[in-house]
Amino acid sequence: MLTCRSLFVAWAVIWGACLTGSSLMASEPAGGPVEAAAAEAGGATVAEMIDARFGVIVGYMAAVLFWEPVKTIPIPLIVLILLCGSVFFTVYFGFLNIRGFKHAIDITRGRYDNPDDPGEISHFQALTSALSATVGLGNIAGVAVAIQLGGPGAVIWMIVIGLFGMTAKFNECTLAQVYRKVHPDGTVDGGPMHYLEIGLQQKGFPFLVAKLFGLVFAVFCIGGSFGGGNMFQANQATSAIRGMIGDAARLDWLIGGILAFLVGLVIIGGIRRIGQVTEKIIPLMCSIYVLAGLVILVMHARQIPAAAVLIVQSCVAPEAIFGGFVGVMVQGIKRAVFSNEAGVGSAAIAHAAAKTDEPVREGMVAMLGPFIDTVVICTMTALVVIVSGAYQEPGAGEGVEMTRWAFADTLSWFPVVLNISVLLFAYSTMISWSYYGEKAWQYLFGSSRQAVILYRSIFLGFIVLGAISSLENVISFSDLMILSMAFPNVIGGVILAPKVKALLADYWTRYRNDEFVTYD
């Protein structure tokens, strides 16, 4: 097939760049322009030079996108929008995250799955596809980063935003189902860029305003697919591989190239292939990781109450309130959103493809994502990091290295399991985010074969860039892109919420009257 052949050629180009970069890093300066620049930079490698330039670009972007409207309170505007939006949706829909929880589980179990409904994947596959993009390194590395930067108190805010984020995700995924486009061949186009454009026009907004909302979201979604959905995953996967084979920095190019090739093998199959892969990977890797975490918590059961007290004290103590309270809150919210993506609209792209003729039903399935991702897995990881004392250990490293240290302190053999989990988490996240970014790319440039091949080639190239970049720059870029998706999505979601509320009231009435057909 032309697509497979072209993707192979693109990968070959990336592979060639990897080998070239690797050889450059291994050799002494030979007088060429790249080598000369490296020599003048005090012996910096090519990868270090690229990382330095990347850091400068990220710095300029952060100054614009993380603007703080109130100088005396250092809270970025986007964090305020996410927090206020999540609280609004929860109250507006009558705490649906609580009263609709059991029904959401029944739907996910397949009780209402009609194989003849329009769509490409089942409710369960839609959930696992979305979870594969969220249950991942945000849970393993992101939690450690939050505690490292914001202290144990950041965990409280991760849980809070996870609970409120459940209803935010319900709103956006319901809208994705309402405004999706089902093509004659059965494929689906859906997500915030579509419901923002169409829905806002139906609310009376001018075409250009509605189109601008969709365009802005699509641009940031593509950036998010390259950042948090790609570079961060590749960076931490590379770190995990280093932990297994030794600190061989010169192999980063090679590791990045191999990861790019493996991701390319799956993404050529689209959402159906992604759904088939994630429905097998996600339950397995979640089970392994949660089981290991529970073993450690049982072994440290006596320290759990003290850890819980420390988390609360770090969040509400007077010195925290008047000192670092805002910083703790911001770090907790940023890491929670990076982990569960509630409010940013990414999961709506996957849930739009689910087989159903009831938009509210898929929205309820989507609610389970933030609960599983943040309230359960992130909290467990945080407790492991705290009870082990890893966040206070100077030699524990950062990100996934800190989590590895925390697990290894109790289970000496666990780093091997964690490294495998990291690779699986990173891999599943990258293949899901490639689909998100590809749909946004198609919204901007069309769905021609050439446009799709170009996006996939760029996506694979960013895997290599993530493998050689520093964690600091990767996290900053990832936060910028993913959090910025919330600007148009939350604002548009609030405007369109009355439509969702009307659909929910109708659905809930029919559910209580036992009007739905079951298939269990």
Question: Which residues are covered by each model-predicted region?
Answer:
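N-terminal alpha-helical transmembrane segments of multi-pass membrane transport
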Residues: 2-3, 7-8, 12-137, 148-152, ...
